[in-house]
């Protein structure tokens, strides 16, 4: 009974022992796999030769691969493996390209494909926006290559935005529109100029002179009365006939002669109108002008005196 039990146990444990994993040289760890398969997108003559040999194996004889640069080779590979023509390579397209270039024999066993680690490494280092897709710019620009030749103590080159900003400020300073806005007076200066102009216009020395000039140019009630008197003297009427009779009679004394003499004497002698005219001339020459209400009262009094004198002359002629 015991040998039978031992035989059954041996038969049950034998397949399990043969199927258990074993250590061997045919199964390297992940670190060894990563070292054996470098990133072909990294700059270097060895990686470039690897990609060129892959393209030669494809039979692309229309392109001279020896004269292509690294950027041109990568763009050529990108165009070959962008199957959906989206302008981006996803993980499967990267896996297909790297498997065909690095390990063609591992394409039939995806579970043991060592290129998967390379795809993960490429997406980790070169996928800058982290969307899981590779653009041509991300494929060509390997991170850390541009700063490799720069020493730590060496200052970096200034950004191109700084000279543009300086040039823009100089153009703004030289622009005629900015100069006009700088030269144009502001609202405070205009208001200040208006206040000074009003002060000059309200100067008490200049205001009477301006009123005197206005009085001299604009005909007032005195000028209208004198014009009416001249018109009456020229037009034929009872006064004109009386004046003609007075001249015909000569120097004979009479009431009409006395009236004509008085009229001529009033023409020669200064009267109220002459005094008013002298006052107006004195105002125009620079004397101090009187206030406007007093001047209007004086003109009214002069007009009344002139009308009374005309009535007296008519009564004398009649």
UniProtKB/Swiss-Prot annotation:
Residues 235-272 have a biased composition (Low complexity). GO terms for cellular component: extracellular region. One of its GO terms (molecular function) is calcium ion binding. Residues 177-318 are annotated as: Disordered. Ca(2+) 1 binds at residues 82, 84, 86, 88, 93. Mediates cell-cell adhesion in a calcium-dependent manner. Able to inhibit growth in several cell lines. This is Cell growth regulator with EF hand domain protein 1. It comes from Homo sapiens (Human). The lineage of its organism: Eukaryota, Metazoa, Chordata, Craniata, Vertebrata. The gene is CGREF1.
């Amino acid at each position: 009974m015991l040998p039978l039990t031992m035989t059954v146990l041996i038969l049950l444990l034998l397949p399990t022992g043969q199927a258990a994993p074993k250590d061997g040289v045919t199964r390297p760890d992940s670190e060894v796999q990563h070292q054996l398969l470098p990133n072909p997108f990294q700059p270097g003559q060895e990686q470039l030769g690897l990609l060129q040999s892959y393209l030669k194996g494809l039979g692309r004889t229309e392109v001279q691969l020896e004269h292509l640069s690294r950027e041109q080779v990568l763009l050529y590979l990108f165009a070959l493996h962008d199957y959906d023509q989206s302008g981006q390579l996803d993980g499967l397209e990267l896996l297909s390209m790297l498997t065909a270039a690095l390990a063609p024999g591992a394409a039939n066993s995806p579970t043991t494909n060592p290129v998967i680690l390379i795809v993960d490494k490429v997406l980790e280092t070169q996928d800058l926006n982290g969307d899981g897709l590779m653009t041509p710019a991300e494929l060509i620009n390997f991170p850390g290559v541009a700063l490799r030749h720069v020493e730590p103590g060496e200052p970096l080159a200034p950004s191109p935005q700084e000279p543009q900003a300086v040039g823009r400020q100089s153009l703004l300073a030289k622009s005629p529109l900015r100069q006009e806005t700088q030269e144009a007076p502001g609202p405070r200066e205009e208001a200040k100029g208006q206040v000074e102009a009003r002060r000059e216009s309200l100067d008490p020395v200049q205001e009477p002179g301006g009123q005197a000039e206005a009085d001299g140019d604009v005909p007032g009630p005195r000028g209208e009365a004198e014009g009416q008197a001249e018109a009456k003297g020229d037009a034929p009427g009872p006064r004109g006939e009386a004046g003609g009779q007075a001249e015909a009679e000569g120097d004979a004394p009479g009431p009409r002669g006395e009236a004509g003499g008085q009229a001529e004497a009033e023409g020669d002698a200064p009267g109220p109108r002459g005094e008013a005219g002298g006052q107006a001339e004195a105002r125009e020459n620079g004397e101090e002008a009187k206030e406007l209400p007093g001047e209007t009262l004086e003109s009214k009094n002069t007009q009344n005196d002139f009308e009374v004198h005309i009535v007296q002359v008519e009564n004398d002629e009649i």
